[in-house]
Amino acid sequence: MARLIKTLSPKEDKKPSSNAALQNFLKTATHYNNVIPQETIISSGSLILDSDAQVRSGMIVRLVGKGSELGKSAQGFVFLENYMKTMPNSKALYIKAEGRLSKKKLDKTGLKFTYNIEDWTEGTVFIVCSNIAEPIFKMIVDTVHDAYHAGEHIAWMIDSMDGLILEDDLKKGVTSGGMVAGVPKLTKLLFRHLALPNMHYDSLGVITSQYSAQIKIDTYSPNAPNQGSSSSGSSAQHQADYVFEYQTINQGDLILENNALKPDKFTNKILGKFARVKVLKSADDITGNMYSVPIRRGEEYKGSNQIWRSYELADLLIGYELVNKGGAWLTFESDIIEDARTEGVEILEKINGINKLYAYLEENEAIMEFLKKKILALIQQ
């Protein structure tokens, strides 16, 4: 008996599709596939650091170090400053998780702070005085989300993770047994909630923390596994885009009136310092690199203006071989001199000694701006 073979019409002749489950997911689940981040470069304020590190909107930056006055908080505020200068319709959140930041230090940032939600407008920083982790994390996630849908951009800074505590640990009290959650657990919790929206909504996150031993109230409880040299633990190295480690300031890092002598309050004043920054994690293959950023003292210098431009520029000119060393003499490349002349800027061919080069740049704003543009063009190639 002959078998009947059914002939399919063109409409019926369809292959099984693997797209159905994905299409259903995209229709029903929470995702960020339709939100394309701009990944705009945000300056660290330092030409030296920016010459290699390319921090962008959507990233989270960790600033760690052992000790105070290393420059962690100051650098964090510079990131907030430059984010608000770069991103349209932007403002910032500052989570004051520790009570140590004085009004004087806030004034030093050059930023406009407010505690009043009605005054939190474009270009300002709202201070949140709280250290309870869960509501802070939720608030940041919700604020970043709401800002995106309002056509705004948000930078946020937690200063510091060491000051945060979980709600359950707060309820235990200071005398109850057991360990409270350390920074590694808090960091992991934060990144699980915030990493994706922060990236796709072009926010910028800055987190400071110190080196610290694990908080341990019960002396008989077993030691936890070692999770890394800093209080940020392994989660920082794996989940942050950049981790900058600020080194202890030694006498050799000080910038003095006379660097050949010891500092003295009256006869050899401290003019500034070199903040040494080691990259523990990077998005640009610069992990392990060390950078020295010159910082100048003085109440008149605020925010990113605390970075000593003439020192940075001189070092970069030598590094990029736009200025050549020959004994004590420093000679500008002839091409640079000619390019400057076409723009109405006259540059000396030779200068005797690095200190005189610093002074020459400091005293000639037009020359410094011209050379800064040249360096920026090389950095951005």
What are these regions (language model features)?
Residues 66, 86-179, 184:
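Conserved inter-motif catalytic segment of the P-loop NTP-binding fold
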Residues 328-381:
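Terminal-proximal interaction/regulatory segments of ATP-powered molecular machines
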